[in-house]
Amino acid sequence: MKIVILDGYTLNPGDLSWAPLEKLGDLTVHDRTDAHEIIPRATGAEVVFTNKTPLAAETIRSLPELRYIGVLATGYNVVDVDAARTAGITVTNVPTYGTHAVGQMVFALLLELCHHVQHHSSEVKRGRWSQGPDFCFWDFPLVELAGKTMGVVGFGRIGRRVGAIADAMGMRVIAHDPYAADPPGYAEFAFVSMDDLLKQADVVSLNCLLTDENRGMIDADALRAMKPTAYLINASRGG
């Protein structure tokens, strides 16, 4: 069985082993694959793995031996799933690997906005603090999150993780998700409409997959509805 990985470097830059897959068949790993290289490299393969290399309908139809596509990420948006279904090809993803990492990234971005850590670190290294007239040094106001409102759009695994971190930091948490009904045990929590979330939140964290229903939901009107001081963190995925 021929197995092809189209963009292995994004998943394994050298710290993991491909040995388990090598036991299943004739494995070829490409670090990166441009669009014009997909068909030549995948021709004859029964199994193709991709992380971010797109597999469009035309490409899938050009690979008659293909029986399985493994998306090495959560979003299916890089694969034309309808074309794969028509061709009888199974498509799978990895739905839960990034829950904690994405939650952490949301707050890494947010804390940088609140404290400008990189800027102040660079300025301290330049000597501005030691040369300054005061013990305290800052170029921007430092924003405290405790007591502020975190608005989570999309309250699945990642959204709930973001909410849990916000709760631990003393924030009030509100969420909008038309498909979620089970409230968490945070100190302060409420499901609200999207309009109310935009109006109330000091931080809006987008943690949903892209669908036809929510495409373009953060438009000019949505931005105008937010507080002038609010932060918008986009941690969504393509599909």
Region spans (language model):
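Phosphate-binding beta-alpha-beta segment of Rossmann-like dinucleotide-binding domains, i.e.
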Residues: 87, 95-149, 164
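Rossmann-fold NAD(P)-binding glycine/threonine-rich loop
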Residues: 77-87, 236-239
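N-terminal Rossmann-fold NAD(P) dinucleotide-binding loop
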Residues: 159-160
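Short beta->alpha connector loops at strand-helix junctions that form conserved
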Residues: 31, 72-73, 89-100, 236
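N-terminal glycine-/charge-rich "phosphate-binding" loop or analogous flexible N-terminal tail
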Residues: 1-47, 172-174
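Rossmann-like adenosine-cofactor binding region
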Residues: 55-61, 174, 178-239
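Glycine-rich Rossmann-fold phosphate-binding loop(s) that bind the pyrophosphate
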Residues: 155-156
